[in-house]
Amino acid sequence: MRKLFTSESVTEGHPDKICDQISDAVLDAILERDPNGRVACETSVTTGMVLVTGEITTNCYVDIPKIVRNTIEAIGYTRAKYGFDSDTCAVLTSISEQSPDIAMGVDESLESKQGGMDKEDVIGAGDQGMMFGYANNETSEYMPMAISIAHKLSRRLSEVRKNGTLPYLRPDGKTQVTVEYEDNKAIRIDTIVVSTQHGPEVTREQIEKDIFEHVISKVVPVEFLDENTNYYINPTGRFVVGGPQGDAGLTGRKIIVDTYGGYGRHGGGAFSGKDPTKVDRSAAYAARWVAKNLVAAGVADKLEVQLAYAIGIAKPVSISVETFGTGKIDDRKIVEIINKVFDLRPSAIIKELNLRRPIYKQTAAYGHFGRTDVELPWESLNKLEEIKNLI
């Protein structure tokens, strides 16, 4: 049976991604000075303005307006004619401390209050919720092909803009990839969509030629392209007005781009701007770590892990797996392996993955999972032998 599946990505200059990067830049700046800082930082951008809000509890000072301007400059919004630039945009801040009602459950979990002696029981989950992790073996990074290629296209768009290969490009852009499957195996790419902001002086024909030559052909495996592959490059014909001038942006509004492109389920919680006591982030990273190690160990060809937590409780209230008919062993056995190999209490996740450090801004564009350009601890295949010994 044949079917099509599509995923999208966006560049670092997309309005929502600007917000994610600002929120994570603030988080990184605080963790660099205060590894135990509590951060929930939200950002909104619109024409000529940035608003940073949230709850931050820390013993250090960070210059948020300076962080905002430096982040916008690094993305590439440096000229007024782009409709948004780092020097002239207004930066507003409204920051308060973390609610003491939340802090009391995070600082000391219910297990600890009831006399638990295990040091990893001390920190309770920062909220309730469910988080999903996914991995499959259709790419070398154990990611679905559509989102993997879409991210690489978006990253390449920024590369050719910043290195001067295509100097007329501007920071905003989006990509989309449709993969055709036969009997659940990726066999070809059916459609590629690239929309990129550009200067008014360049023709659509030139953009199409350059994007195909310098972006698509440099990224997409040629063996997955054929004469029937569809290419849509700036299909509206013009994309001069973009970034926050074209659309307002918010932190946490690209959660499917951030994860598996819709191929795996999502619990609904965003990542950027959140310190690792927030299980929306740390447990989603842990779930990916679990799923990737299990697939790499040969437990299944596709595997999705769900973790669920209650606020103030250290241990997950549930762990479940789905192998989509590809499992080599029973799902109940897989859950047993997870419980034996992985400690999924927030304190243990933070310790094992070394999450109290400034590593987050680099995740805020081009995906949090399956990255080949940066090293991320939840992508480590460091549990393979333990898993194989239990299969």
Curated annotation (Swiss-Prot):
One of its GO terms (molecular function) is magnesium ion binding. Binds 2 divalent ions per subunit. Its cofactor is Mg(2+); K(+). The keyword Nucleotide-binding applies. It is found in: Cytoplasm. It is an enzyme of class 2 (transferase). Pathway: Amino-acid biosynthesis; S-adenosyl-L-methionine biosynthesis; S-adenosyl-L-methionine from L-methionine: step 1/1. It comes from the Bacteria. ATP binds at H14, D172, G173, K174, R238, F239, D247, R253, K254, A270, K274. Mg(2+) binds at D16. Homotetramer; dimer of dimers. This is S-adenosylmethionine synthase. The lineage of its organism: Bacteria, Bacillati, Bacillota, Clostridia, Eubacteriales. The gene is metK.
